[in-house]
């Protein structure tokens, strides 16, 4: 059996690596004597995984983790005890038993919010941001260049970002990017900067925004949440 947990990654802990985050959760599980299931083989380890790890420096209120158990536990008690030991910024918000397929197979899209700072507005005073975003939304082809593996080498290839980028929206002084996820890949947040700078009159870089991952979704349009 397994439980699916929704948790936050905020504040200075947005700079903790994926491996360190996994180690943090494992230690906290052991401290609370949670009956976690271990893998088999010569090097057994706790059976748990975090879906689509965040890049360093990005905050989120909607991260997901699967934990396999040997026996059922009281989930309310689990939430209280885990959060008592986890550092500020990491908090398990919800937990439920889940016998469905792995969460990695459920996720079809991701939504990022590029929260615009004063430096952005200083550089884009006379720009209609919503109108510029609509330019991207109306295009069939938005060419990007990125590295792909070919044999033992990595080469630069040109791709159409619209295969992954569903839409861009301006909401509450933030640019929301709705991005499809598939077996063939997705779009990293950094590529959104290239798209905006190359295909619109918007001038933006990483110093102009605070970046947050809003959530992972079960549909390609970023509407159906994992926890319903």
Feature map (PLM): residue ranges:
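Extended, well-folded interaction surfaces typified by the phenylalanyl-tRNA synthetase beta subunit core
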Residues: 6-12, 16, 20, 31
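Short, charge-patterned binding micro-sites
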Residues: 38-67
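Ordered, amphipathic secondary-structure segments that act as subunit-interaction surfaces
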Residues: 61-113
